[in-house]
């Protein structure tokens, strides 16, 4: 099965709240068949959400929430109901209880296993989304190593963000290969390290990530979704997402 393409709506910033019709129009015009966002029912209501998707001919690849939303039982139930109503299989989680302590990761892993089991029973998939901080040393072990050993690979999958792996000084191709049993939903992000040491986000193909090598590894791992994610851009939104979409088509074959 060939992976499908989508875009994360984070690149549109505040327009997601003020101009959602324009945002999804840009997604459609750029050539993306799908997108990833949060719980659209909470922001726009169910009827408007369905109207927006139908009018633009778009699908939703996945739903993304922070750790605290998963730790809140009421929020979790609302998000599960949303995903089931919309036919969304993949739920993403960013963050842990405490990124600076081993105990924070272990506490989070216990919750991830519980939620992963619950979602699996509902026909959904729990995916942990990495940043760079999971690769920081916590006294002989990293957060990513804790997550890898303390969670059940059949319940907790990885939403691998290839840029953050590279930004942390690791090889994203090797990371994908080492976690192929958890890989399926990918964030393809590009960028570079700025003069201040912070991440500078760029359109796909304009940064430091070897994306052609990453797509080969992702395909070998059975990728279902390749989602273009750019936290922010200096370009007009439509120009930005069109550049990334064209790169995905011409260089990645997605």
Regions found by a protein language model. Name each.
Residues 1-89, 181, 249-254:
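N-terminal pre-domain/capping segments
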Residues 3-9, 35-37, 60-65, 91-93, ...:
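Hydrophobic faces of well-ordered beta-strands that scaffold small-molecule active sites
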Residues 7, 27, 35, 53, ...:
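Conserved, mostly hydrophobic/aromatic
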Residues 21-22, 74-79, 105-113, 140-145, ...:
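Charged helix-capping and loop-helix junction motifs
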Residues 24, 35, 121-208, 215:
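Acidic/histidine-rich catalytic cores of soluble enzymes
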Residues 41-42, 68-158, 165, 238:
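Active-site acidic/histidine proton-transfer and metal-coordination neighborhood
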Residues 227-237:
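A short, acidic, flexible beta-alpha connecting loop/helix-capping segment that sits on the rim
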Residues 236-254:
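C-terminal helical cap(s) of enzyme catalytic domains, especially alpha/beta-barrels
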């Amino acid at each position: 099965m060939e992976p499908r393409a989508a875009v994360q709506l984070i690149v549109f910033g505040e327009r997601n709240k003020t101009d959602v019709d324009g945002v999804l129009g840009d997604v459609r015009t750029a050539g993306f068949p799908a997108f990833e966002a949060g719980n659209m029912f909470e922001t726009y209501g169910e009827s408007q959400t369905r109207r927006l998707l139908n009018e633009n001919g778009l699908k939703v690849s996945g739903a993304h929430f922070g750790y605290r939303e998963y730790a809140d039982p009421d929020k979790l139930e609302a998000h599960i109901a949303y995903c089931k109503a919309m036919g969304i299989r993949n739920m993403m989680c960013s963050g842990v209880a405490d990124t600076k302590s081993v105990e924070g990761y272990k506490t989070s892993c216990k919750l991830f296993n519980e939620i992963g089991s619950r979602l699996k029973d509902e026909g959904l998939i729990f995916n942990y989304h990495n940043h760079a901080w999971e690769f920081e040393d916590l006294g002989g072990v990293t957060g990513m190593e804790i997550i890898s050993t303390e969670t059940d690979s059949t319940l907790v999958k990885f939403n691998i963000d290839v840029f953050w792996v590279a930004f942390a000084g690791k090889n994203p191709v090797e990371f994908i290969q080492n976690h192929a049993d958890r890989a399926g939903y990918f964030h393809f992000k590009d960028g570079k390290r700025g003069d201040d040491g912070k991440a500078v986000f760029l359109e796909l193909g304009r940064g430091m990530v070897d994306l052609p090598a990453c797509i080969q590894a992702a395909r070998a791992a059975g990728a279902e979704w390749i989602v273009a994610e750019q936290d922010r851009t200096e370009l007009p939104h439509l120009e930005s997402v069109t550049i990334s979409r064209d790169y995905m088509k011409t260089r990645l074959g997605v």
